[in-house]
């Protein structure tokens, strides 16, 4: 949640400003602060804060939140939001209220942020489903490792982890016994089962296990815990690996989940989905102070790309009309020398 807190805090900062402005929208000169010889109006406050980096980021989040609420609002239920909220509360335990307060959040503002995140998440997953081609399935199958049974030791510092690894390498070492003695996990849990698409096990641990043969033991694997921001250290031993079937369709359901999960984590893919939603909403920036907040989504949306291509074609046509001789010369030159794309296409034939 610490990552989320940083993001949410920025959202709340400007959301509060915008809420204040909205409440006083009938008169931007409404006074919110008075003092001897001076006053501060809603307009003063808005103009003072709108150019800050926090406000820029917060306005972007506010726009995205409104756009996705309008387009996907019926896809996320109150029950889902409540469930996610309580899960986070349980993870933080007694410190949850303090964590909210530190981020200038109330339970309701945090729930609104959860809802916005889930709306984007839904849209991304729906877009990912449209990418489920046979080629994508086969690509996912190539890197897929079926269920593995592993024993895993979790440790809190590098020095201890290296010492434990040396102990495991000693002749006759009993991995299971050492694991149960040394691991720092609750209830001394050391046995796990997962495949290469597991999301409840650190990615680097999954990769290490996937690369091992039965009986193989990994080196020390260092992983930054995204919740505590503390490093954890893992050592894994693969005790059994399921044989991989030759037909990818045997794993189609699982591969589908993996493909969707991977695309959902892909920031470029996420940005394209957001860009398309912004295009569909026909978002227009009215205040030049926020002119660049959507720059990262420029030319990613379908409409934006089409408009850009149309503009390029139009400009090229106009240039050709104004300089016919230059256009003819360009065409002649193009006919004599293959374009970069043509050259790339021709290379395999020459091999």
From Swiss-Prot:
Which reaction(s) does the protein catalyse, per the Swiss-Prot or TrEMBL entry?
[protein]-peptidylproline (omega=180) = [protein]-peptidylproline (omega=0)
Lipid-linked residues (S-diacylglycerol cysteine)? 23
Biological processes per GO annotation: protein folding
Q: What is its main location?
A: membrane
A GO term, aspect molecular function: peptidyl-prolyl cis-trans isomerase activity
Boundaries of each PpiC domain copy?
A: 145-240
User: What keyword terms does UniProt attach to this protein?
Assistant: Cell membrane, Isomerase, Lipoprotein, Membrane, Palmitate, Rotamase, Signal
PROSITE patterns, alphabetized: PPIC_PPIASE_2, PROKAR_LIPOPROTEIN
Please list the residue ranges that the record marks as compositionally biased, kind Low complexity: 303-317, 326-351
List the subcellular locations. Answer: Cell membrane
Does this UniProt record's set of keywords contain Lipoprotein?
yes
Q: What does this protein do?
A: Plays a major role in protein secretion by helping the post-translocational extracellular folding of several secreted proteins.
Q: What is this protein called?
A: Foldase protein PrsA 1
Q: Which species is the source of this protein?
A: Streptococcus pyogenes serotype M18 (strain MGAS8232)
